[in-house]
């Protein structure tokens, strides 16, 4: 099994610790884990040039950074996004990377194998609930077609890993073991979700109409995949 992990921060703090603990329960010795640390491994800020939409993702100014991450996600059964809770949201570095993935949304040029993957979003905070952060990251994966995204949150009551209490450490480990079991179970039985199928059919209808499909690049993609006809990405 292959796992892609995208860290929304460069430092190895509490959120990083959570992810590593989950991986200890989730990954087997022969599994392949590819990790990307932002901003180091990510692109510079998206400038909204629309090149990825209109011309192709390979022409994006940040393609040399974006496409290796995309390739890893494509080859993985499980995709993990983690980010500390920054002002009730994902880090700016993570959001910037998600901006570069916009062309892969179901509205544009989704890829078939994303409909069979499993996602996990992870966030921690010192006090305020980080639920919005994990939901926001999960939304990004779902719009790329990922049918099931699990969410892991932890209110650490600490500023860094050295000040986290033993009680919180135990809570972290217990929650990590539980969610790793769920993720592994789903990864062994991948299938598209009803919501994902509904979204697909909504935008299939749009791409089927030359008048409604405003971007020829997107429409050509749907035609090439056979989705305008009888082919479906989850089969």
Which residues does each predicted region cover?
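N-terminal beta1-alpha1 ligand-phosphate binding loop
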Residues: 2-31
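A structural signal for isolated positions on well-ordered beta-strands in alpha/beta enzyme cores
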Residues: 2-4, 34, 120, 150
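Residue-level recognition of beta-strand->loop/alpha-helix junctions
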Residues: 7, 37, 152-153
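A generic structural motif
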Residues: 28-34, 146-147
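Mobile beta-alpha loop/short-helix "lid" or hinge segments that flank ligand
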Residues: 41-43, 110-113, 143-160
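Helix-loop-strand module that forms the ligand-binding subsite of alpha/beta enzymes
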Residues: 61-147, 218, 222-233
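Glycine-rich phosphate/pyrophosphate-binding loop and the adjoining helix
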Residues: 147-235
């Amino acid at each position: 099994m292959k796992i892609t992990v995208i860290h929304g921060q460069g430092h190895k703090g509490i959120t990083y610790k959570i992810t590593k603990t989950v991986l200890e329960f989730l990954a087997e010795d022969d599994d392949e884990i590819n990790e990307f640390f932002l901003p180091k491994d990510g692109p510079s800020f998206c400038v909204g040039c629309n090149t990825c939409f209109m011309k192709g993702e390979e022409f994006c100014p940040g393609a040399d950074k974006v496409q290796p991450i995309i390739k890893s996600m494509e080859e993985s059964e499980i995709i993990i996004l983690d980010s500390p809770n920054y002002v009730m949201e994902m880090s700016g570095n993570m959001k910037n990377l998600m901006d570069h993935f916009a062309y892969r949304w179901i509205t544009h040029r989704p890829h078939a194998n994303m409909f069979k993957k499993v996602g996990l979003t992870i966030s921690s905070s010192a006090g305020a609930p980080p639920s919005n952060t994990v939901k926001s990251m999960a939304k990004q994966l779902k719009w790329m077609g990922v049918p099931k995204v699990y969410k892991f949150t932890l209110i650490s009551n600490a500023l860094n890993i050295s000040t986290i209490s033993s009680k919180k450490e135990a809570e972290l480990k217990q929650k990590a073991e539980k969610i790793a079991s769920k993720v592994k179970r789903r990864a062994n039985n991948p299938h598209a979700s009803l919501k994902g199928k509904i979204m697909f059919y909504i935008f299939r209808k749009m791409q089927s109409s030359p008048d409604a499909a405003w971007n020829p690049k997107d429409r050509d993609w749907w035609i090439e995949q056979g989705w305008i006809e009888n082919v479906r990405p989850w089969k």
